[in-house]
Amino acid sequence: MTIVAPLGREADDPLVIAGTALRSRLLIGTAGYPTQAIMAEAVRASGAEVATLSIRRVSLRGHGSDTVSLLSGFRFLPNTAGCETARDAVMTAELAREALGTNWIKVEVIGDRETLYPDVAETIEATRQLVDAGFVVLPYCNDDPVVCSRLADLGAAAVMPMGSLIGSGMGVANPANLELICRRSPVPVIVDAGIGTASDAVIAMELGAAAVLLNTAVAKADDPVRMARAMRHAVEAGRLAFGAGRIPRRARAEPSSPQLGLVGS
């Protein structure tokens, strides 16, 4: 009997973050679903191994939240959503470590409430402090190659540049910058925010991203479970296409069939 590995999830192509190997290159959020039951079904349908959640929805008394209980067996990536200063982000990360027993943290420090753009200076400072405190830091940032390089130099385990505005569904707004970030980064690049549908995830992966993190695209879809499956296959297909290498774009046609031996030639 031949066992065929799922597309893009071959054992020899794991996503490695801080020495942890993950089969899936899709990370998924847990907020905003119609019900907790649908959330749990969609997250499992996505094939993801890492689920993000806000520390504000986790009990610090040891009872856990519905999300934690429903997703037993997943690796959790708590985030610092809602924080506007490095100080608040560090405090939230410490609470997350106490509540969930993990030193993984997704750093979000927002600098503008209308666009939810990250505050670069505060994000860099939070990353510096949290790395020094022994956290595995995955910072959300803008799609700036210099910022991503600085975060990696500080010890971030991965960088998470935005595809476009959080929750916008606009896809990858600046593919040239994202490709440059992916090509230069010494740590995994996880495209975070703005993914609206499966084709957006494919594009992010084809540009060289190591992974995609998304939430709204699945949570707010008409059928979250079906969209989660679509995203799973999209990330896998995009990774395979990146590894295979696309043909160059040309301004004119080039026949794919051999011309030798044609009638009349």
Swiss-Prot record:
Residues where 1-deoxy-D-xylulose 5-phosphate binds: G167, A193, G194, N215, T216
Record-listed E.C. numbers: 2.8.1.10
GO biological process, any: thiamine diphosphate biosynthetic process
InterPro entries referenced in this protein's UniProt entry, alphabetically: Aldolase_TIM, Thiazole_synthase_ThiG, ThiG
Pfam families from the UniProt entry: ThiG
Keywords of this entry: Cytoplasm, Schiff base, Thiamine biosynthesis, Transferase
GO-annotated cellular components: cytoplasm
Main subcellular location of this protein, as a coarse class: cytoplasm
Gene3D superfamilies xrefs: Aldolase class I
Subcellular location: Cytoplasm
Active site, renumbered: K106
Pathways involved: Cofactor biosynthesis; thiamine diphosphate biosynthesis
SUPFAM superfamilies from the UniProt entry: ThiG-like
Record flagged with keyword Transferase: yes
Keyword Kinase: no
Domain of life: Bacteria
Catalytic activity from the UniProt record: [ThiS sulfur-carrier protein]-C-terminal-Gly-aminoethanethioate + 2-iminoacetate + 1-deoxy-D-xylulose 5-phosphate = [ThiS sulfur-carrier protein]-C-terminal Gly-Gly + 2-[(2R,5Z)-2-carboxy-4-methylthiazol-5(2H)-ylidene]ethyl phosphate + 2 H2O + H(+)
An annotated Gene Ontology molecular function: thiazole synthase activity
UniProt family annotation: Belongs to the ThiG family.
Function of the molecule: Catalyzes the rearrangement of 1-deoxy-D-xylulose 5-phosphate (DXP) to produce the thiazole phosphate moiety of thiamine. Sulfur is provided by the thiocarboxylate moiety of the carrier protein ThiS. In vitro, sulfur can be provided by H(2)S.
Subunit structure: Homotetramer. Forms heterodimers with either ThiH or ThiS.
Designated name of the protein: Thiazole synthase
Organism phylogeny: Bacteria, Pseudomonadati, Pseudomonadota, Alphaproteobacteria, Hyphomicrobiales
Gene: thiG
